[in-house]
Amino acid sequence: MAIVYNRVKSTNDLELKDRLVAINRVTKVTKGGRTFTFAAIVVVGNEDGVIGWGLGKAGEVPAAIAKGVEAAKKNLIRVPVHNGTIPHEQAASYGGASVFLKPATTGTGVKAGGAMRAVLDSVGVTDVLAKSKGSSNPHNLVKATIQALAEMRSPLMVAQNRGISVEKVFKG
């Protein structure tokens, strides 16, 4: 079955908040000396089920962050969030980074670290258990986490795909 991501078409009515995940300074050595540029990975979300990520590169940090925010606004998806948690367990990997997300009861909080926490906070998840294995590269962790969130399906979506009622999804 092909995965259809829930793309967000318009950002006009969304109040997006941006979070800086990581900044990387890159040095290019030339005959005339060293040239420094900066790469910033940024996550934007409305804390209500919409998330996007972007990478910006520039000669100055603020310009790199601004470019990352603009790139993230062009790359938004909608994620089903119910009662502050995700609907089901989900695993995903990107490059050498593997992530595993598991729903949690109310009051648990976001049990995730680093780049995964920024993504989950931006999407509006308040209770989730998360584990990352393999690479801790923030670029790959962000992409793997967003891939896992993009593969989430709400019970209503599962019921519509199967042609059954929502009650049958839970009770078999």
Swiss-Prot record:
Pfam family of the protein (one): Ribosomal_S5_C
Any single GO BP term: translation
Domain S5 DRBM: 16-79
Tagged with keyword Coiled coil: no
Entry keyword set: Ribonucleoprotein, Ribosomal protein, RNA-binding, rRNA-binding
Gene Ontology terms: cellular component: small ribosomal subunit
MF GO annotations: rRNA binding; structural constituent of ribosome
SUPFAM superfamilies documented for this protein: dsRNA-binding domain-like, Ribosomal protein S5 domain 2-like
Record flagged with keyword Transmembrane: no
UniProt domain comment: The N-terminal domain interacts with the head of the 30S subunit; the C-terminal domain interacts with the body and contacts protein S4. The interaction surface between S4 and S5 is involved in control of translational fidelity.
SUBUNIT field: Part of the 30S ribosomal subunit. Contacts proteins S4 and S8.
UniProt family annotation: Belongs to the universal ribosomal protein uS5 family.
Function noted in UniProt: With S4 and S12 plays an important role in translational accuracy.
Name of this chain's protein: Small ribosomal subunit protein uS5
Species of provenance: Porphyromonas gingivalis (strain ATCC BAA-308 / W83)
